[in-house]
Design a protein with these regions (language model features):
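Intrinsically disordered, low-complexity terminal regions
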Residues: 1-223
Length: 223
């Protein structure tokens, strides 16, 4: 009997995987400590890998134009498992990560405009090639971007962190507050505002700069 229960216990903690077909979507929204890996393809799908639970514990459903990825049980159960979801997208315009989740790109994400939101200790690390990018981090969320985007808009608050030193941008608008931090590279036009302990560091030699700092905020050129 003990051996049987031990076998069941080991089986429940073994890694399980499942590949799912998905309806069309243009955005991805992930939460609850799930790691998501994005890859471009010809048809939308998701491969779920889980240790310490069942694949049925992981929800991958398209709501409107967004793919929602979360745990079926909203209680603290999800903190005891390890979940990775490999998402194949056709086109993507929006990425949202919260509650200690992470999003990574396998290859460069190409888009006209890309909207990125990161909050509650979540993390986004991606490579992009887009005409414009909007990044908003808060509550210890972190975004690290590389690649190219002529137009970049950054907002960071409540200890949110944005690092785009490796993202080539021509025009940048950055607003940082409440202990937020932004690191940016800009070549032509910079508008930067930092307040309430917010910190902005920029690289490059923009032809025009319009900066403002208040309440302990800081905007400085970096080496």
């Amino acid at each position: 009997m003990i051996a049987f229960l031990l076998t069941l216990s080991i089986a429940s903690w073994a890694q399980q995987s499942e590949t799912r077909s998905l309806n069309s979507f243009r955005g991805v929204k992930v939460s609850q400590a799930i790691d998501v890996y994005l890859k471009k393809g010809d048809k939308e799908s998701a491969r779920v890998e889980i240790s310490g639970g069942q694949t049925s514990d992981v929800v991958t459903e398209v709501e409107g134009s967004s793919l929602r990825i979360k745990m079926r049980d909203s209680r603290n159960f999800w903190s005891k498992v390890n979940v990775k979801v490999y998402v194949t997208y056709v086109n993507i315009e929006k990425i949202s990560a919260s509650s200690a989740s992470s999003v990574f790109s396998e290859g460069q994400i190409k888009a006209d405009h890309l909207d990125i939101g990161v909050s509650s200790a979540a993390n986004v690390e991606i490579s992009v090639d887009a005409n414009s990018v909007m990044v908003d981090t808060s509550s210890a969320g972190e975004a690290v971007l590389e690649g190219k985007s002529p137009k970049l808009e950054v907002e960071a608050s409540s200890a949110g962190d944005v690092d785009t030193y490796r993202l080539e941008s021509e025009t940048v608008v950055a607003r940082v507050s409440s202990g937020g931090e932004a690191k940016i590279s800009v070549s032509k036009d910079l508008e930067a505002q930092a307040s309430s302990g917010g910190d902005i560091r920029y690289r490059g030699n923009p032809g025009r700069t319009n900066t403002h700092s208040s309440s302990g905020g800081s905007v400085k050129k970096s080496n």
